Amino acid sequence: MIKFVDIKIGDDVTFYALIENMQKRFTPNKSGYYGATLSDGDSSIDARIWDCNLVESKDITAGNVYRFTAHVNEYAGKAQYVIKNIETISE
């Protein structure tokens, strides 16, 4: 399983992670997005979900593990994961 420590800025990645917390926020021009803290079991990262429909249409909630597809950008000198897709995991 891929760990956050192995992912570099500029990478396009698919990984499994726990949503530790997630909050809907708004940009200065009132566009909605979600800020989330994701954990791979060893470390946590900051993620942005610019497409609110990814969260709202699939009933994505904190405290659960999902499969994410993301692009890693650099923002303010740190890695920022921009989530492109979220998939629920069947048991």
Task: Cite the ranges covered by each PLM segment.
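N-terminal basic/disordered segments at the start of proteins
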Residues: L18-E20
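OB-fold nucleic-acid-binding modules
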Residues: M1-F15
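Acidic/polar residues in short coil/turn loops that connect beta-strands
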Residues: L38-D42
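OB-fold single-stranded nucleic acid-binding module
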Residues: M22-Y33, S43-E91
